């Protein structure tokens, strides 16, 4: 099984009044990793991908600070449904896990806005890349 990783810079604007990365920014880090995954692994043109985030849950383990410089975000596929993919993520600083997350994406028919089967080429790439 292969895990996709993306290095994301910690920006000054990510820091809140407590001096660490604001909790909402973790979802942005995960989104940045996911969009890179779509481009790098699925070779998908994001302007042509009709997929929405149906749910996300994040468990925070330790704060991330500006001085950490960057985080590594992992992307794994835990489950493939007919029209959905459940992805798991870790946000890491070095070897330390700062957060763990699970996100479910749903493929939509761009005409109706209703769930539609995942594109076969995306399903095949995810199965191959992650050994599903």
Locations of the language-model features?
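Broad hydrophobic/π-residue packing in well-ordered secondary structure
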Residues: 12, 18, 26-29, 60, ...
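HotDog/MaoC-like acyl-thioester-processing domains
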Residues: 65-67, 78-132
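Residue-level recognition of well-ordered beta-strand positions that form the cores
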Residues: 7-9, 57-59, 74-76, 90, ...
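Hot-dog-fold acyl-thioester-processing enzymes
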Residues: 1-55, 110-132
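Hydrophobic beta-strand-centered segment that forms part of the acyl-chain substrate-binding groove
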Residues: 37-72, 77-79, 98
